[in-house]
Regions:
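Vicinal oxygen chelate
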Residues: 1-28, 50-56, 91-100, 143-160, ...
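Surface-exposed beta-loop interaction hotspot
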Residues: 56-57, 68-107
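Short, flexible helix-coil linker/hinge segments at the edges of structured domains or between repeats
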Residues: 38-46, 69-86, 123-128
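Short beta->alpha transition motifs characteristic of CBS
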Residues: 65-72, 160, 226-233
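Core segments of cupin and vicinal oxygen chelate
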Residues: 46, 97-151, 196, 233, ...
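Short, basic/aromatic recognition patches
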Residues: 36-44, 199-205
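Short amphipathic alpha-helices in soluble, non-transmembrane regions
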Residues: 26-32, 110-112, 192-198
């Protein structure tokens, strides 16, 4: 097993958040996570009130951790409305796809989600990015799609310096590393709609345990699936995890 390149390409990481008073970084380190940040220290952004850490798990998968400082940030993340009440101080906020062509991949997901990105930025070269990625003169451009009303997002990121390379691997659903699922309320209708958009699935929807799923590749070769819970009110549905209404 090798460490995932921090510049991508592919589904680079998942992101975990917590309030600033929680030992988020320490919990991951105790389980063998290795910090990627320069000097092995969190990188704090006073603009956003967030402390950031990139790290590798014991198998070399990349992950991001964010400590949120302030009530407004926690409310925006859904913590005060959901996780705090359930005594769950750590939650996953996003999946991140690193790509050699951000705009192309964002157009692909725009067609899938039928919604516009809620934010697009370019992060200039500077000490913040250098320390976060442990790369001199790092420069990235990023866009985000909201996947529910508030707290869950998809991040699409392109390194401009050094440039994110093209993927040279054809991934399968069983390949090592990350894939992600998009929960839907009518999987047959979404399966047919996405097929009409030209998306190639590995198979029609199939019942796998508590879910009906159909796996596909996006235009960068990332593996994702549509999934619909057999019991829409069951404990493993998005509705159960997100009391604000799900995706």
């Amino acid at each position: 097993l090798t460490d995932m390149p921090v510049i991508g390409p592919g589904m680079s990481h998942t992101c975990y958040q917590s309030p600033i008073d929680q030992p988020l970084f320490e919990k991951f380190a105790a389980q063998g996570a290795r910090f990627l940040n320069r000097h092995d220290e969190p990188v704090y952004s006073p603009t956003y009130g967030v402390s950031y850490v990139y790290a590798y798990d014991p198998e070399g998968n990349l992950l991001e951790m964010e400590k949120l400082d302030g009530e407004q940030l926690l409310k925006h993340a859904g913590y005060l409305d959901n996780w705090d009440k359930d005594n769950k101080p750590i939650w996953m906020s996003q999946v991140s796809l690193f790509t050699p062509d951000r705009d192309r991949l964002m157009q692909f997901y725009h067609n899938i989600f039928q919604t516009n990105p809620h934010r697009i930025v370019e992060v200039p070269v500077g000490e913040f990015g250098d320390n976060l990625f442990d790369i001199d003169n790092a420069k990235v451009q990023i866009g985000w799609f909201r996947l529910n009303r508030q707290s869950k997002v998809m991040e699409i990121l392109q390194f401009l310096n050094p440039p994110t390379p093209q993927s040279m691997i054809e991934r399968e659903p069983t390949s090592l590393g990350y894939s992600f699922s998009l929960e839907v309320s009518d999987i047959e209708a979404e399966y047919q709609r996405l097929k009409a958009l030209g998306i190639e699935f590995f198979s029609p929807p199939v019942k796998l345990g508590r879910f009906v799923q159909a796996y596909a590749r996006d235009i960068d070769g990332n593996i994702f699936s549509l999934r619909q819970p057999v019991d829409s009110d069951g404990p493993f549905s998005v509705k159960a995890y997100d009391k604000r209404g799900g995706l």
